[in-house]
Amino acid sequence: KKAKSFGINAIEYVSGLYTNHTDTLEKMSMSKLGKELLKRSQDYGVDNVLIMIDSQGSLASSNNKERLEAIDNHKRWIDFSYKLGCETMRVNLSGEDNLEKWTENSVKSLSVLSNYNKDLNVVVENHGGLSSNGKYLANVMSKVNIDNCGTLPDFGNFCIDGSPRLCAKWYDIYKGVKELMPYAHAVSAKSYHFDDNGHE
């Protein structure tokens, strides 16, 4: 209702709105919640396009038990996303600092999730750590090579040392966007400051 009142016809969700308020999930199952939210959005002519999943386990972890638990957690959200009518679900690739292991673990997890429901896009955002390196994340995508698995390039999230607000080292944002766009199913377009030549 609020989105429609602002003239917004498509919205995205974030899992933390529900996992951080467990009373919501205690009152109704994820399945019922998804159906209820879909009904509300349809009543106002608003499309549910994407949901961002956070804090559901480390999909790139080298601890196999931990990684498999993360996959199971994300499968629940795939079911939820599909019932909600979303086209796309965003995940994070965290849990490993070694590039070779991170790549291998990420490919395994994404392959399972992407094949779990071929009608839903599973995308990775450059969201800290090794995933904020465009070259590394693009390499993961090329190895997964599944149509409904891709990226969500975030123009302001290419910090490879620190956090965006206190970043010690940035990956080249233009290079990163160029590397990730061939695999993109959605984008998080951000712009802040430009120099006299029009560069961010």
Task: Report the location of each language-model feature.
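Boundary/entry segment of secreted carbohydrate-active catalytic domains
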Residues: 1-2
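Acidic/histidine-rich catalytic cores of soluble enzymes
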Residues: 10-11, 107-200
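Structural motif corresponding to the early beta-alpha repeats
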Residues: 6-108, 121, 157
